[in-house]
Amino acid sequence: MESLQVKEYMNHYPVTFTPDMVVEEAALRFLKTKQIGGPVIDKNNQLIGFLSESDVLSKMIETIYYNEHIADVADLMRKDVLTVKPYDSVIELGQQMLKNKPKVYPVVDDDENLLGTISRNDVLRAIDLHLRSGYKG
């Protein structure tokens, strides 16, 4: 079977966040880009976490109920992030996505520099295109 690699189907321009960004700004980025999650990066483009729409929504609802100060991205981001490499197999990633919860995976190089993201939708598109091509290599 032809090797479908992550780098061929990943989003090279994902929505990204910084740890000091306020949640309102993160929400606005989600609304503008219509993406459901994104990597949190430091000033050197190193992956340090991941923020989802759900994380932001949960905090914003809590803020309404308790009239609290909105948090920063660093307060909400997940620090233990599942990542993939650009040379990883899309098929294997699809199988991993069926077992694990993340719908979006950051794509990083061997030094953990962010290269992009790949979503469940990207994986579905890759497999669909492959099947429609009649397995031609």
Task: Outline where the language-model segments fall.
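Tandem CBS (Bateman) regulatory domains
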Residues: 1-13, 52-83, 89-98, 114, ...
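Short charge-dense sequence patches
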Residues: 3-8, 22, 26-27, 40-49, ...
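A generic helix-loop boundary/linker signal
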Residues: 16, 20, 46, 66-67
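The conserved cystathionine-beta-synthase
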Residues: 17-34, 41, 83-101, 108, ...
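A glycine-centered beta-loop-beta connector
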Residues: 30-33, 38-54, 97, 105-122
